[in-house]
Regions:
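Non-catalytic, well-ordered alpha-helical segments in soluble enzyme domains
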Residues: 472-483
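Short, well-structured beta-strand/strand-turn elements
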Residues: 467, 481-494
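Short, conserved helix/loop micro-motifs enriched in His/Cys and acidic residues
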Residues: 446-461
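Divalent cation-coordinating acidic motifs and surrounding scaffolds
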Residues: 369, 373-443
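Flexible, low-complexity junctional segments that flank or bridge functional domains
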Residues: 57-402, 457-459, 472, 489, ...
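Bacterial N-terminal signal peptides
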Residues: 41-49
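N-terminal secretory signal peptides that target proteins for export/translocation
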Residues: 1-35
Protein backbone atom coordinates (compact mmCIF):
# COMPACT_ATOMS: atom_id res chain seq x y z
CA UNK A 1 0.00 0.00 0.00
CA UNK A 2 1.12 3.57 -0.60
CA UNK A 3 1.95 5.85 2.29
CA UNK A 4 -1.14 7.13 4.07
CA UNK A 5 -1.43 10.86 3.43
CA UNK A 6 -4.01 13.04 5.08
CA UNK A 7 -6.08 14.66 2.39
CA UNK A 8 -5.32 18.35 2.10
CA UNK A 9 -1.72 18.11 3.35
CA UNK A 10 -0.54 18.71 -0.20
CA UNK A 11 -2.68 21.75 -0.79
CA UNK A 12 0.68 23.34 -1.14
CA UNK A 13 1.56 26.79 0.04
CA UNK A 14 2.25 27.65 -3.57
CA UNK A 15 -1.52 27.60 -4.25
CA UNK A 16 -2.18 30.30 -1.72
CA UNK A 17 0.90 32.17 -2.89
CA UNK A 18 -0.32 31.98 -6.48
CA UNK A 19 -3.78 33.17 -5.48
CA UNK A 20 -2.41 35.99 -3.35
CA UNK A 21 -0.21 37.18 -6.21
CA UNK A 22 -3.22 37.24 -8.51
CA UNK A 23 -5.50 38.98 -6.01
CA UNK A 24 -4.07 42.40 -5.34
CA UNK A 25 -6.07 43.51 -2.28
CA UNK A 26 -5.22 46.27 0.13
CA UNK A 27 -4.02 44.78 3.46
CA UNK A 28 -6.93 46.18 5.44
CA UNK A 29 -9.60 45.76 2.79
CA UNK A 30 -11.61 42.54 2.57
CA UNK A 31 -13.42 42.30 -0.73
CA UNK A 32 -16.50 40.19 -1.32
CA UNK A 33 -18.53 39.74 -4.47
CA UNK A 34 -22.32 39.62 -4.26
CA UNK A 35 -24.84 39.03 -6.97
CA UNK A 36 -27.60 41.60 -7.06
CA UNK A 37 -30.68 40.66 -9.05
CA UNK A 38 -32.90 43.50 -10.17
CA UNK A 39 -35.58 43.70 -12.86
CA UNK A 40 -34.59 40.31 -14.22
CA UNK A 41 -30.94 41.11 -14.87
CA UNK A 42 -27.76 40.56 -12.94
CA UNK A 43 -25.15 43.03 -11.80
CA UNK A 44 -21.99 42.53 -9.78
CA UNK A 45 -21.65 44.74 -6.73
CA UNK A 46 -18.26 44.91 -5.04
CA UNK A 47 -18.53 45.34 -1.28
CA UNK A 48 -15.57 46.72 0.63
CA UNK A 49 -15.04 46.58 4.38
CA UNK A 50 -13.84 50.00 5.41
CA UNK A 51 -12.40 51.04 8.75
CA UNK A 52 -15.86 52.00 9.96
CA UNK A 53 -17.08 48.47 9.31
CA UNK A 54 -19.89 49.48 6.93
CA UNK A 55 -20.45 47.94 3.52
CA UNK A 56 -20.97 50.08 0.46
CA UNK A 57 -22.17 48.63 -2.82
CA UNK A 58 -20.79 50.02 -6.06
CA UNK A 59 -23.75 51.69 -7.75
CA UNK A 60 -24.39 50.88 -11.41
CA UNK A 61 -24.36 53.72 -13.88
CA UNK A 62 -27.54 54.71 -15.68
CA UNK A 63 -28.75 51.93 -17.97
CA UNK A 64 -28.59 52.70 -21.70
CA UNK A 65 -29.90 50.83 -24.74
CA UNK A 66 -27.19 48.99 -26.62
CA UNK A 67 -26.57 46.27 -29.16
CA UNK A 68 -24.90 43.04 -28.01
CA UNK A 69 -21.60 44.34 -29.43
CA UNK A 70 -21.58 47.40 -27.15
CA UNK A 71 -19.07 50.22 -27.49
CA UNK A 72 -15.27 50.14 -27.21
CA UNK A 73 -15.52 51.66 -23.74
CA UNK A 74 -18.07 49.12 -22.54
CA UNK A 75 -16.15 46.24 -24.09
CA UNK A 76 -13.07 47.31 -22.16
CA UNK A 77 -15.11 47.53 -18.95
CA UNK A 78 -16.53 44.09 -19.71
CA UNK A 79 -13.02 42.74 -20.25
CA UNK A 80 -11.83 44.24 -16.96
CA UNK A 81 -14.81 42.77 -15.11
CA UNK A 82 -14.12 39.28 -16.53
CA UNK A 83 -10.48 39.50 -15.50
CA UNK A 84 -11.43 40.61 -11.99
CA UNK A 85 -14.09 37.92 -11.57
CA UNK A 86 -11.62 35.33 -12.81
CA UNK A 87 -8.91 36.62 -10.48
CA UNK A 88 -11.08 36.19 -7.41
CA UNK A 89 -13.09 33.08 -8.38
CA UNK A 90 -10.87 30.70 -10.30
CA UNK A 91 -9.35 27.72 -8.48
CA UNK A 92 -5.91 27.70 -10.06
CA UNK A 93 -3.88 24.52 -10.49
CA UNK A 94 -0.13 25.05 -10.05
CA UNK A 95 0.41 21.53 -11.42
CA UNK A 96 -1.31 22.40 -14.68
CA UNK A 97 0.33 25.78 -15.11
CA UNK A 98 3.82 24.45 -14.36
CA UNK A 99 3.41 21.45 -16.65
CA UNK A 100 2.28 23.57 -19.60
CA UNK A 101 4.43 26.58 -18.76
CA UNK A 102 1.84 29.35 -18.89
CA UNK A 103 0.12 31.96 -16.73
CA UNK A 104 -3.63 32.11 -17.41
CA UNK A 105 -4.19 35.73 -16.46
CA UNK A 106 -1.26 36.85 -18.60
CA UNK A 107 -2.67 34.94 -21.56
CA UNK A 108 -6.11 36.42 -20.94
CA UNK A 109 -4.72 39.95 -20.69
CA UNK A 110 -3.04 39.50 -24.09
CA UNK A 111 -6.53 39.35 -25.65
CA UNK A 112 -7.62 42.79 -24.41
CA UNK A 113 -7.27 44.56 -27.75
CA UNK A 114 -9.13 41.78 -29.55
CA UNK A 115 -12.15 42.29 -27.28
CA UNK A 116 -12.02 46.08 -27.22
CA UNK A 117 -11.62 46.38 -30.99
CA UNK A 118 -14.36 43.89 -31.91
CA UNK A 119 -16.78 45.36 -34.46
CA UNK A 120 -19.23 42.52 -35.10
CA UNK A 121 -21.08 39.98 -32.98
CA UNK A 122 -18.85 37.23 -34.37
CA UNK A 123 -15.72 39.23 -33.53
CA UNK A 124 -16.82 39.63 -29.92
CA UNK A 125 -18.24 36.13 -29.42
CA UNK A 126 -15.17 34.36 -30.74
CA UNK A 127 -12.88 36.81 -28.97
CA UNK A 128 -14.61 35.87 -25.71
CA UNK A 129 -14.24 32.20 -26.67
CA UNK A 130 -10.48 32.69 -26.89
CA UNK A 131 -10.55 34.59 -23.61
CA UNK A 132 -12.28 31.68 -21.89
CA UNK A 133 -9.98 29.12 -23.53
CA UNK A 134 -6.88 31.01 -22.39
CA UNK A 135 -7.32 29.39 -18.97
CA UNK A 136 -6.76 25.97 -20.62
CA UNK A 137 -9.62 24.19 -18.90
CA UNK A 138 -11.57 21.46 -20.69
CA UNK A 139 -14.73 22.21 -18.69
CA UNK A 140 -15.13 25.92 -19.46
CA UNK A 141 -17.01 27.27 -22.45
CA UNK A 142 -19.39 30.05 -23.55
CA UNK A 143 -23.15 29.74 -23.91
CA UNK A 144 -25.29 32.24 -25.87
CA UNK A 145 -28.09 33.90 -23.89
CA UNK A 146 -31.37 35.52 -24.99
CA UNK A 147 -30.85 39.05 -26.38
CA UNK A 148 -27.08 38.59 -26.17
CA UNK A 149 -24.53 37.60 -28.77
CA UNK A 150 -26.01 35.12 -31.23
CA UNK A 151 -23.10 32.73 -31.01
CA UNK A 152 -22.16 30.09 -33.57
CA UNK A 153 -24.21 30.09 -36.77
CA UNK A 154 -22.18 27.76 -39.00
CA UNK A 155 -23.39 24.16 -38.54
CA UNK A 156 -20.95 21.40 -37.70
CA UNK A 157 -19.60 19.46 -40.65
CA UNK A 158 -16.95 16.77 -41.03
CA UNK A 159 -14.67 15.33 -43.65
CA UNK A 160 -14.89 11.56 -44.28
CA UNK A 161 -11.76 10.58 -42.34
CA UNK A 162 -10.64 10.05 -38.75
CA UNK A 163 -7.33 11.31 -37.37
CA UNK A 164 -5.32 10.19 -34.33
CA UNK A 165 -2.23 11.70 -32.69
CA UNK A 166 1.16 9.99 -32.63
CA UNK A 167 2.51 10.38 -29.09
CA UNK A 168 5.93 8.81 -29.71
CA UNK A 169 7.56 12.23 -29.25
CA UNK A 170 5.61 14.66 -27.06
CA UNK A 171 7.91 17.51 -28.11
CA UNK A 172 7.08 17.06 -31.81
CA UNK A 173 3.65 15.39 -31.99
CA UNK A 174 2.28 14.28 -35.32
CA UNK A 175 -1.07 13.13 -36.70
CA UNK A 176 -2.10 10.32 -39.02
CA UNK A 177 -5.16 8.92 -40.76
CA UNK A 178 -6.72 6.23 -38.56
CA UNK A 179 -10.04 5.69 -40.32
CA UNK A 180 -11.91 6.40 -43.57
CA UNK A 181 -15.39 6.62 -45.00
CA UNK A 182 -14.38 4.92 -48.24
CA UNK A 183 -17.83 5.29 -49.79
CA UNK A 184 -17.76 9.08 -49.55
CA UNK A 185 -14.14 9.23 -50.68
CA UNK A 186 -14.92 7.09 -53.73
CA UNK A 187 -17.89 9.31 -54.59
CA UNK A 188 -15.88 12.51 -54.30
CA UNK A 189 -14.35 14.13 -57.36
CA UNK A 190 -12.02 16.29 -55.28
CA UNK A 191 -8.33 16.04 -56.14
CA UNK A 192 -6.18 13.53 -54.28
CA UNK A 193 -8.92 11.77 -52.31
CA UNK A 194 -8.31 8.52 -54.17
CA UNK A 195 -4.83 8.33 -52.59
CA UNK A 196 -5.86 8.83 -48.96
CA UNK A 197 -5.14 5.66 -46.99
CA UNK A 198 -5.27 4.58 -43.37
CA UNK A 199 -1.88 5.12 -41.76
CA UNK A 200 -0.88 8.09 -43.92
CA UNK A 201 0.90 10.90 -42.09
CA UNK A 202 -0.62 14.40 -42.02
CA UNK A 203 2.01 16.90 -43.20
CA UNK A 204 -0.10 20.08 -43.29
CA UNK A 205 -3.67 21.20 -42.60
CA UNK A 206 -5.16 23.96 -44.77
CA UNK A 207 -1.67 25.17 -45.61
CA UNK A 208 -0.40 25.10 -42.01
CA UNK A 209 2.53 22.88 -41.09
CA UNK A 210 1.84 20.68 -38.08
CA UNK A 211 3.74 22.97 -35.64
CA UNK A 212 1.84 25.96 -37.08
CA UNK A 213 -1.46 24.08 -36.89
CA UNK A 214 -0.88 23.14 -33.24
CA UNK A 215 0.08 26.69 -32.30
CA UNK A 216 -2.88 28.21 -34.18
CA UNK A 217 -5.62 25.82 -33.07
CA UNK A 218 -4.41 25.31 -29.49
CA UNK A 219 -6.19 28.54 -28.57
CA UNK A 220 -9.47 27.23 -30.05
CA UNK A 221 -9.25 23.83 -28.35
CA UNK A 222 -10.38 23.36 -24.75
CA UNK A 223 -7.81 21.25 -22.93
CA UNK A 224 -6.14 20.79 -19.54
CA UNK A 225 -3.05 18.74 -20.42
CA UNK A 226 -0.79 18.24 -23.47
CA UNK A 227 -1.97 14.67 -24.17
CA UNK A 228 -5.58 15.82 -24.13
CA UNK A 229 -4.74 18.77 -26.37
CA UNK A 230 -3.19 16.56 -29.05
CA UNK A 231 -6.06 14.10 -28.81
CA UNK A 232 -8.63 16.84 -29.38
CA UNK A 233 -6.62 18.54 -32.11
CA UNK A 234 -6.45 15.22 -33.98
CA UNK A 235 -10.14 14.53 -33.40
CA UNK A 236 -11.08 17.96 -34.73
CA UNK A 237 -8.91 18.09 -37.88
CA UNK A 238 -11.77 16.60 -39.96
CA UNK A 239 -14.41 18.68 -38.17
CA UNK A 240 -15.65 22.18 -38.89
CA UNK A 241 -16.57 22.97 -35.29
CA UNK A 242 -19.13 25.70 -34.43
CA UNK A 243 -17.10 26.71 -31.35
CA UNK A 244 -14.24 27.77 -33.63
CA UNK A 245 -14.53 30.96 -35.68
CA UNK A 246 -15.75 30.18 -39.23
CA UNK A 247 -12.91 32.17 -40.77
CA UNK A 248 -10.48 29.54 -39.45
CA UNK A 249 -11.76 27.07 -42.07
CA UNK A 250 -11.77 26.73 -45.84
CA UNK A 251 -14.67 25.51 -47.98
CA UNK A 252 -13.11 22.04 -47.89
CA UNK A 253 -10.36 20.37 -45.87
CA UNK A 254 -7.04 20.70 -47.67
CA UNK A 255 -4.43 18.23 -46.47
CA UNK A 256 -0.89 17.38 -47.44
CA UNK A 257 -0.12 13.77 -46.56
CA UNK A 258 2.73 11.28 -46.70
CA UNK A 259 2.06 7.66 -47.60
CA UNK A 260 3.74 4.51 -46.30
CA UNK A 261 6.47 4.79 -48.96
CA UNK A 262 7.31 8.36 -47.93
CA UNK A 263 5.69 9.94 -50.99
CA UNK A 264 3.87 13.21 -50.37
CA UNK A 265 0.61 14.21 -52.00
CA UNK A 266 -2.25 16.68 -51.56
CA UNK A 267 -5.93 15.91 -51.06
CA UNK A 268 -9.03 18.07 -50.80
CA UNK A 269 -11.74 16.44 -48.69
CA UNK A 270 -15.36 17.64 -48.73
CA UNK A 271 -17.22 18.69 -45.59
CA UNK A 272 -20.33 16.57 -45.06
CA UNK A 273 -23.22 16.34 -42.62
CA UNK A 274 -21.79 14.47 -39.61
CA UNK A 275 -24.60 11.91 -39.43
CA UNK A 276 -23.90 10.81 -43.01
CA UNK A 277 -20.28 9.86 -42.30
CA UNK A 278 -19.48 6.25 -41.36
CA UNK A 279 -15.84 5.59 -40.51
CA UNK A 280 -14.07 2.27 -40.99
CA UNK A 281 -11.26 2.16 -38.44
CA UNK A 282 -7.72 0.97 -38.95
CA UNK A 283 -7.99 -0.86 -35.63
CA UNK A 284 -10.76 -3.11 -36.87
CA UNK A 285 -11.09 -5.27 -33.74
CA UNK A 286 -10.21 -4.05 -30.26
CA UNK A 287 -10.17 -7.33 -28.36
CA UNK A 288 -9.69 -10.42 -30.57
CA UNK A 289 -10.65 -13.58 -28.72
CA UNK A 290 -13.13 -11.78 -26.43
CA UNK A 291 -16.90 -11.66 -26.87
CA UNK A 292 -19.49 -9.30 -25.43
CA UNK A 293 -21.74 -11.01 -22.87
CA UNK A 294 -23.51 -7.91 -21.53
CA UNK A 295 -24.10 -4.44 -22.97
CA UNK A 296 -25.08 -1.56 -20.75
CA UNK A 297 -25.16 2.22 -21.16
CA UNK A 298 -21.99 2.81 -19.11
CA UNK A 299 -19.91 -0.25 -20.02
CA UNK A 300 -19.77 -3.48 -21.97
CA UNK A 301 -18.80 -6.78 -20.34
CA UNK A 302 -16.59 -9.16 -22.34
CA UNK A 303 -15.25 -12.62 -21.60
CA UNK A 304 -12.51 -14.62 -23.35
CA UNK A 305 -13.61 -17.25 -25.82
CA UNK A 306 -11.01 -19.71 -24.48
CA UNK A 307 -12.52 -19.78 -20.99
CA UNK A 308 -9.73 -17.95 -19.16
CA UNK A 309 -10.74 -16.56 -15.78
CA UNK A 310 -10.88 -12.97 -16.99
CA UNK A 311 -13.59 -10.31 -17.11
CA UNK A 312 -13.02 -7.31 -19.40
CA UNK A 313 -15.01 -4.12 -18.83
CA UNK A 314 -15.02 -1.69 -21.73
CA UNK A 315 -15.92 1.44 -19.77
CA UNK A 316 -17.93 4.10 -21.61
CA UNK A 317 -19.47 6.58 -19.17
CA UNK A 318 -20.52 7.47 -15.61
CA UNK A 319 -24.13 8.51 -16.07
CA UNK A 320 -27.12 7.93 -13.77
CA UNK A 321 -27.74 4.49 -15.26
CA UNK A 322 -24.46 3.40 -13.65
CA UNK A 323 -26.33 2.47 -10.46
CA UNK A 324 -28.43 -0.17 -12.20
CA UNK A 325 -25.66 -1.13 -14.62
CA UNK A 326 -23.34 -2.06 -11.74
CA UNK A 327 -26.15 -3.94 -10.00
CA UNK A 328 -26.64 -5.95 -13.20
CA UNK A 329 -22.90 -6.61 -13.46
CA UNK A 330 -22.65 -7.91 -9.91
CA UNK A 331 -25.78 -10.05 -10.25
CA UNK A 332 -24.44 -11.57 -13.47
CA UNK A 333 -20.95 -12.06 -12.02
CA UNK A 334 -22.32 -13.74 -8.90
CA UNK A 335 -24.55 -16.04 -10.93
CA UNK A 336 -21.68 -16.97 -13.27
CA UNK A 337 -19.16 -17.38 -10.43
CA UNK A 338 -16.91 -14.61 -11.79
CA UNK A 339 -16.26 -12.51 -8.68
CA UNK A 340 -12.79 -14.00 -8.13
CA UNK A 341 -11.72 -13.55 -11.77
CA UNK A 342 -9.03 -11.19 -13.03
CA UNK A 343 -10.63 -7.85 -13.93
CA UNK A 344 -9.37 -5.55 -16.70
CA UNK A 345 -11.06 -2.17 -17.11
CA UNK A 346 -10.39 -0.34 -20.39
CA UNK A 347 -11.34 3.33 -19.91
CA UNK A 348 -9.82 4.63 -23.16
CA UNK A 349 -13.27 5.35 -24.65
CA UNK A 350 -14.92 6.68 -21.49
CA UNK A 351 -16.19 10.15 -20.69
CA UNK A 352 -16.90 11.60 -17.24
CA UNK A 353 -19.91 11.86 -14.95
CA UNK A 354 -20.27 10.74 -11.33
CA UNK A 355 -20.70 7.78 -8.94
CA UNK A 356 -17.36 6.18 -9.75
CA UNK A 357 -16.64 5.38 -6.10
CA UNK A 358 -19.95 3.51 -5.92
CA UNK A 359 -18.76 1.28 -8.75
CA UNK A 360 -15.32 0.76 -7.21
CA UNK A 361 -16.89 -0.46 -3.96
CA UNK A 362 -18.21 -3.40 -5.97
CA UNK A 363 -15.02 -4.03 -7.94
CA UNK A 364 -12.45 -4.24 -5.10
CA UNK A 365 -12.02 -6.23 -1.89
CA UNK A 366 -10.23 -3.63 0.26
CA UNK A 367 -11.14 -0.31 1.90
CA UNK A 368 -9.94 2.68 -0.10
CA UNK A 369 -9.67 6.44 0.19
CA UNK A 370 -11.98 8.40 -2.07
CA UNK A 371 -11.20 11.70 -3.77
CA UNK A 372 -11.75 14.94 -1.87
CA UNK A 373 -12.64 18.45 -2.98
CA UNK A 374 -13.02 22.07 -1.96
CA UNK A 375 -14.30 25.45 -3.10
CA UNK A 376 -12.34 28.64 -3.52
CA UNK A 377 -14.34 31.07 -1.41
CA UNK A 378 -15.62 33.96 -3.51
CA UNK A 379 -18.92 35.59 -4.36
CA UNK A 380 -19.73 32.72 -6.72
CA UNK A 381 -18.92 30.01 -4.17
CA UNK A 382 -20.81 31.80 -1.41
CA UNK A 383 -23.96 31.88 -3.53
CA UNK A 384 -23.62 28.17 -4.27
CA UNK A 385 -23.17 27.36 -0.58
CA UNK A 386 -26.17 29.49 0.38
CA UNK A 387 -28.33 27.79 -2.26
CA UNK A 388 -27.33 24.30 -1.06
CA UNK A 389 -28.01 25.26 2.55
CA UNK A 390 -31.70 25.85 1.80
CA UNK A 391 -32.17 23.20 -0.88
CA UNK A 392 -34.51 20.43 0.33
CA UNK A 393 -33.26 16.86 0.50
CA UNK A 394 -34.37 14.66 -2.36
CA UNK A 395 -36.83 11.89 -1.57
CA UNK A 396 -34.85 8.91 -2.90
CA UNK A 397 -34.01 5.48 -1.48
CA UNK A 398 -30.69 4.97 0.25
CA UNK A 399 -28.08 2.96 -1.67
CA UNK A 400 -24.91 1.54 -0.14
CA UNK A 401 -22.11 3.96 -0.96
CA UNK A 402 -24.30 6.75 -2.34
CA UNK A 403 -26.08 9.80 -0.93
CA UNK A 404 -28.51 10.54 -3.74
CA UNK A 405 -30.69 12.68 -1.44
CA UNK A 406 -27.82 15.24 -1.24
CA UNK A 407 -28.44 15.53 2.51
CA UNK A 408 -24.69 15.38 3.23
CA UNK A 409 -24.05 18.23 0.79
CA UNK A 410 -26.80 20.29 2.44
CA UNK A 411 -25.49 19.58 5.93
CA UNK A 412 -21.99 20.63 4.88
CA UNK A 413 -23.32 23.88 3.41
CA UNK A 414 -25.22 24.62 6.62
CA UNK A 415 -22.24 23.94 8.92
CA UNK A 416 -18.63 23.48 7.86
CA UNK A 417 -18.79 25.46 4.61
CA UNK A 418 -20.63 28.32 6.31
CA UNK A 419 -17.98 28.40 9.04
CA UNK A 420 -15.21 28.52 6.43
CA UNK A 421 -16.87 31.49 4.74
CA UNK A 422 -17.26 33.30 8.06
CA UNK A 423 -13.61 32.59 8.88
CA UNK A 424 -12.60 34.19 5.55
CA UNK A 425 -10.61 31.13 4.47
CA UNK A 426 -9.22 31.09 0.96
CA UNK A 427 -10.71 27.65 0.33
CA UNK A 428 -13.25 25.56 2.17
CA UNK A 429 -11.71 22.69 4.09
CA UNK A 430 -11.36 19.56 1.99
CA UNK A 431 -14.27 17.12 2.22
CA UNK A 432 -15.07 13.82 0.48
CA UNK A 433 -15.82 14.73 -3.13
CA UNK A 434 -19.11 16.64 -3.39
CA UNK A 435 -20.30 14.77 -0.28
CA UNK A 436 -21.70 12.13 -2.63
CA UNK A 437 -20.29 9.07 -0.86
CA UNK A 438 -19.34 10.26 2.64
CA UNK A 439 -20.36 13.14 4.96
CA UNK A 440 -18.07 16.08 5.72
CA UNK A 441 -17.28 14.59 9.13
CA UNK A 442 -15.37 11.74 7.44
CA UNK A 443 -11.83 13.07 7.69
CA UNK A 444 -10.07 9.98 6.34
CA UNK A 445 -12.41 9.47 3.38
CA UNK A 446 -12.30 5.70 3.66
CA UNK A 447 -14.95 3.73 1.79
CA UNK A 448 -15.62 0.05 2.44
CA UNK A 449 -16.27 -2.59 -0.23
CA UNK A 450 -19.91 -3.46 -0.82
CA UNK A 451 -21.16 -6.72 0.70
CA UNK A 452 -20.86 -8.44 -2.71
CA UNK A 453 -17.76 -7.49 -4.68
CA UNK A 454 -14.97 -8.68 -6.95
CA UNK A 455 -11.87 -10.12 -5.26
CA UNK A 456 -9.42 -10.76 -8.11
CA UNK A 457 -6.48 -8.67 -9.39
CA UNK A 458 -7.29 -5.56 -11.44
CA UNK A 459 -5.68 -3.65 -14.30
CA UNK A 460 -6.71 -0.28 -15.73
CA UNK A 461 -6.01 0.63 -19.36
CA UNK A 462 -6.00 4.44 -19.63
CA UNK A 463 -5.93 7.07 -22.34
CA UNK A 464 -6.45 10.82 -22.96
CA UNK A 465 -9.84 10.69 -24.68
CA UNK A 466 -11.80 11.45 -21.48
CA UNK A 467 -11.27 13.02 -18.09
CA UNK A 468 -13.15 14.75 -15.27
CA UNK A 469 -14.79 12.00 -13.20
CA UNK A 470 -12.80 9.47 -15.20
CA UNK A 471 -9.64 11.10 -13.79
CA UNK A 472 -11.00 10.45 -10.30
CA UNK A 473 -11.97 6.87 -11.10
CA UNK A 474 -8.42 6.02 -12.19
CA UNK A 475 -6.82 7.94 -9.32
CA UNK A 476 -8.84 6.01 -6.73
CA UNK A 477 -7.51 2.75 -8.15
CA UNK A 478 -3.93 3.98 -8.56
CA UNK A 479 -3.42 6.01 -5.37
CA UNK A 480 -4.87 3.22 -3.24
CA UNK A 481 -2.75 0.52 -4.95
CA UNK A 482 -5.89 -1.27 -6.05
CA UNK A 483 -4.91 -1.80 -9.68
CA UNK A 484 -2.04 -2.04 -12.13
CA UNK A 485 -2.19 0.84 -14.63
CA UNK A 486 -1.00 0.80 -18.24
CA UNK A 487 -1.41 2.95 -21.34
CA UNK A 488 -1.57 6.73 -21.13
CA UNK A 489 -2.85 9.27 -18.59
CA UNK A 490 -6.45 10.42 -18.74
CA UNK A 491 -7.39 14.00 -19.65
CA UNK A 492 -6.59 15.53 -16.26
CA UNK A 493 -9.43 18.03 -15.96
CA UNK A 494 -11.37 17.05 -12.86
CA UNK A 495 -12.58 19.81 -10.54
CA UNK A 496 -15.38 20.11 -8.01
CA UNK A 497 -17.81 22.67 -9.39
CA UNK A 498 -18.08 25.32 -12.08
CA UNK A 499 -19.91 28.62 -11.65
CA UNK A 500 -21.92 30.04 -14.53
CA UNK A 501 -23.03 33.63 -14.93
CA UNK A 502 -24.65 35.77 -17.58
CA UNK A 503 -22.36 38.70 -18.33
CA UNK A 504 -23.76 42.17 -18.94
CA UNK A 505 -22.02 45.25 -20.16
CA UNK A 506 -21.24 46.95 -16.83
CA UNK A 507 -23.88 49.45 -15.78
CA UNK A 508 -26.40 48.32 -18.40
CA UNK A 509 -29.14 45.75 -18.89
CA UNK A 510 -27.58 44.47 -22.13
CA UNK A 511 -26.65 40.78 -21.81
CA UNK A 512 -23.61 39.50 -23.65
CA UNK A 513 -22.97 35.80 -23.01
CA UNK A 514 -22.84 33.20 -20.25
CA UNK A 515 -19.32 32.68 -18.88
CA UNK A 516 -17.96 29.91 -16.66
CA UNK A 517 -15.37 29.55 -13.90
CA UNK A 518 -13.71 26.54 -12.29
CA UNK A 519 -14.27 27.27 -8.59
CA UNK A 520 -12.87 24.25 -6.76
CA UNK A 521 -10.15 21.63 -6.70
CA UNK A 522 -10.54 17.89 -6.88
CA UNK A 523 -7.94 16.29 -4.61
CA UNK A 524 -6.60 12.87 -5.45
CA UNK A 525 -6.56 10.24 -2.67
CA UNK A 526 -2.83 11.02 -2.30
CA UNK A 527 -3.72 14.64 -1.43
CA UNK A 528 -2.57 16.28 -4.68
CA UNK A 529 -4.65 18.58 -6.88
CA UNK A 530 -5.94 16.47 -9.77
CA UNK A 531 -6.40 19.09 -12.49
CA UNK A 532 -3.41 18.92 -14.82
CA UNK A 533 -2.10 16.06 -12.68
CA UNK A 534 -3.73 12.84 -13.88
CA UNK A 535 -2.36 9.46 -12.86
CA UNK A 536 0.79 8.53 -14.78
CA UNK A 537 0.44 4.82 -15.58
CA UNK A 538 2.93 2.37 -14.16
CA UNK A 539 3.69 1.22 -17.69
CA UNK A 540 3.46 4.06 -20.20
CA UNK A 541 2.57 2.91 -23.72
CA UNK A 542 1.96 5.83 -26.09
CA UNK A 543 -0.41 5.52 -29.02
CA UNK A 544 1.59 5.82 -32.26
CA UNK A 545 1.30 5.51 -36.01
CA UNK A 546 3.14 2.20 -35.72
CA UNK A 547 0.98 0.53 -33.04
CA UNK A 548 -2.52 1.97 -33.53
CA UNK A 549 -3.82 -1.04 -35.52
CA UNK A 550 -3.26 -3.36 -32.52
CA UNK A 551 -3.09 -0.85 -29.66
CA UNK A 552 -5.94 -2.14 -27.49
CA UNK A 553 -5.16 -5.82 -27.90
CA UNK A 554 -1.48 -5.12 -27.11
CA UNK A 555 -2.38 -3.29 -23.91
CA UNK A 556 -4.86 -5.98 -22.90
CA UNK A 557 -2.27 -8.72 -23.42
CA UNK A 558 0.36 -6.72 -21.50
CA UNK A 559 -2.07 -6.12 -18.63
CA UNK A 560 -3.00 -9.79 -18.39
CA UNK A 561 0.65 -10.80 -18.54
CA UNK A 562 1.48 -8.41 -15.70
CA UNK A 563 -1.41 -9.64 -13.54
CA UNK A 564 -0.44 -13.27 -14.08
CA UNK A 565 3.02 -12.71 -12.60
CA UNK A 566 3.56 -13.07 -8.85
CA UNK A 567 4.05 -9.76 -7.04
CA UNK A 568 7.36 -9.59 -5.17
Amino acid sequence: MSQQIRVGERLAQEILMADSQRTALQPDCLVYGRRVRSSGYLLIACLSVFSGGELEAQKPSQAIELTPVGTPELREELFDSIIEMTRRREAWSPFKEAHMGYDPLTEMEALRSRIVNATTEDDLYYGLTLLSNARRDSHLYLTPVPDGLKGPSLPEARAPIQILPDYSDMHTPSFFVSGLDQKHLDASESPGVDRVAIGDLIVSVNGLSIPEFIETFRAWTRHSAPQGLYWRLARDIPIRAPATAPWMYREALDLELEDAQGQRYSATLPYLEPNTVSIELGEAELYPGFSVVMERFNFNVLRPDDGRRVVLLQWLDFEYELIQDVMDLIAYSEAQDLLDHTLVIDVTASSGGSRGAYAIQRLVDRPFRTTFGNLRISDAAIEMIEDWAVEPDRDVPEIFGLNESRSWLHEWAQTSAKQDVEAALAYTRATPFKLAHLPHTSEDGILMPAPVHYTGPIAIIGGPNGGSHLDQFVSMFADNDLAFTIGMPTGGYSNTWEAEETLYFPGTTQPVVQFMWNVGHTLRPNGEILEGNAVQPEVYVPLTRENFRTYHRDLLEAALDRLSRPVS
